[in-house]
């Protein structure tokens, strides 16, 4: 689930997608109506007769993922500031958007507590959270209180398989990544045998399983499965197992703090199998961590490549002007997620989910990351997966 500058800080990447899990079960259809029992306007009058519309955004603002979370929060803030600059009126009343930003620490329990605070504050919508593990418990709270939620980086399939009418995402999911990588490994890279290694997180295991299913469907044979953890620093036993299995390709489900040194050790011990991961490895730090061993590695993102984003350059300029720094990762997606909510509210002339949720579900929004529309479950329609390889120490688009 990582893209753009791709987060060049190792400690953060250690856990970011640990909760992006593989969901199961048939999803219920999403209907273009508000959840049963939706309340009225979650707003408050302000001085001068303004209608104050409260929006919530939850991101890790402290801890290992703070740089990603702050970047995403900036994207939300930029969209809200621009909306306020429009001096909108709904039904003759001036509207002011008020952003409530909370730190969920990318932690499920904290995220649920944040969700409760948003409920108490009567927010009209939530943009976030960063990871699936935090988003799942929070989404239950929002669904119970009829608050729509649009995620900008959540890739775990289960997120949109809960049957919730007010849950959406503006990025592809992990199953799409696993499917694309599995097919690419066999059909393009020619792998006849493969091994999977994962970090035992919902994210890593889910991706590894999806990759394996797709690779086997394409005709390859799995010859080994091994496990590590998000805190591992020693990989000797795994390397020994890989030497014995001798696969054509190794898929790693996890993040770069383990994925990179694992690759380095594999190469040091003479394992020449092609090496592949998903967005947990597609970071600017991976080539540095893996050194020369990184050359020829493959990874993916659940999004379009930077140069394919229609509004990437203009957004980066606005972002730098507003915040004095470069785009880190998900701020363009957070910006789009916010704007698709605002567009639905504007069209409905209301912040009441009963009125704007049908517009949100039917969105056909031209965002800076591309066209945004939603399936009945709330997934992004026509989601894109981009596959990269490292050449000369740098990530390049492979497909």
Q: Could you tell me what each predicted segment is?
A:
Residues 5-12:
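Sec-dependent signal peptide hydrophobic core
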Residues 2-5, 21-399:
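Extracytosolic ligand-binding ectodomains
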Residues 16-19:
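C-terminal motif of bacterial Sec signal peptides marking the signal peptidase cleavage site
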